[in-house]
Amino acid sequence: MNNLLDILNKSVNYLEKKGIKNARLTAESIISEVMGMERIMLYAEFERMLSEDDLKKIREKLNDITNNDKKISDNNNFE
């Protein structure tokens, strides 16, 4: 599923695996910026589906933060 809550949780897990401190805050900030909404609204609209364009932007920002050679691809679902 590509709803807000699912992508938020996958993003947090990804950042934690990469050793990023404050992984939840970082993921919330990235997703809220991409979606153009306040962080609190991520939870109020947790069932909202994300477009492929939104997912691509989130992946790019996560990759920028982790600055890792192994990038998140469209196929590996943030894991």
Range-by-range predicted roles:
Residues 1-50:
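Non-catalytic accessory regions of SAM-dependent methyltransferases
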